[in-house]
Amino acid sequence: MAKARITKALKSMTQPPSPARLAIGGMLAMASAFGIGRFVYTPILPVMIADGALTPASAGIVAAANFLGYLLGALAGASAATQRHPRLFFLGGLLAGGLSLAGMAAPPSIPVFSIMRFVGGFGSAFVIVCLSSMALEPLVRAGRIGLSAAPFAGVGFGIAFSSGLVSVLASAGVGWKAMWVANALVSTAMALLLFFLLPAPSLPAHAPAPAGRKGLPRISPALAALVVSYGLFGFGYVITATFLVAIVRETASLATLEPYAWAIVGLAGALSIPFWSWVARRTTDVFAYAAGCLVEATGVALSVVSPTPATIIISGIFLGGTFMAITAIGLGIARRLTQMAPQRAQAIMTSAFGLGQIVGPALAGHMRETSGSFVAPSLIAAAALVVAGALGAFVARSR
């Protein structure tokens, strides 16, 4: 009986997954790699700063290391090997992320922290690049294009869960090392579950060869503008996404919001995907992308221009309610503009995004050390998001 159940389970792993299974698997992957793997740094960071493990400047360097890993991982993700074996690199990236989280529990060391975050960023890039083959493209081929944005909601759920976990541990007097280990266990458990949930994708018979110049997307003016816009978006969102909880902790009147500020971002992010998908259907995907950038610019500016409990809540809703939707919609536009090489286009977009993310936290951490506040870097980020939205309008005219 037991043998029959095992045989049935193994057989199910080789069957084409249902659209619901693809969407749920994609959500778990994004929750593990990004909601926890990337963004748990935000609620743990103030605890590390208070304990003397990091300063605002060194925190920016460590954050930038994660995004450097993401950038280099995205470049590596454009290789023929990842296109031939997407599941191997997908699962490997998830496991690398979990191990890197555990490594953050090491004794305080900027080089060690930077290496761990680099490894996590490198792995997460493989996850999002290979997600196209593992879940997004199969959903499109199954005629369920409406579900192709669902995996990105996993980031919001992961943020909300990890933020809640950190708050519970903090209220129990647990230190930052245990916070990292607890989140590492959750992230790794999700990765192991995905081993059974998502089988290797089957490429359609008409799929182009993964290697060679035929697989390279043509860089049209519209795609070039989108890539630049996406890089500015990466720079614009990441400063607030990295330091929001630190901004809240530094303002005495906002102290009661610290356990909730990042959870608000996560919940808004989880709910943002259906809303912005609806906006895209009622208008166009490019309009939704540009409008999202402008809404996010408002949220980023509100976090520092008038930091009251009300504006911080609005800022969290605007940030969380846009950044994953913009990510998903931007990648969808790129896939549409380069239909013959979607995974390579996704790698190019991810690289531009990663470059913007490297500059953002390093600049913000340095400016915080010299000026004593996050006001100037946050306003620069808001301006970058306005330009990103304007470039989105150019994409609409050029395509």
Regions found by a protein language model. Name each.
Residues 110, 143, 147-199:
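Helix-loop-helix hairpin linking two adjacent transmembrane segments in secondary transporters
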Residues 87-90, 289:
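Primarily marks hydrophobic transmembrane alpha-helices of the MFS/SLC 12-helix fold
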Residues 116-154:
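Cytoplasmic helix-loop-helix junction between adjacent transmembrane helices
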Residues 42, 222-263, 267:
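Extracytoplasmic gate region of multi-pass secondary transporters
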Residues 337-373, 381:
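A late C-terminal transmembrane helix in Major Facilitator Superfamily
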Residues 53, 85, 106-111, 305-307:
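Helix-breaking motifs and short loop linkers at transmembrane-helix boundaries and internal kinks
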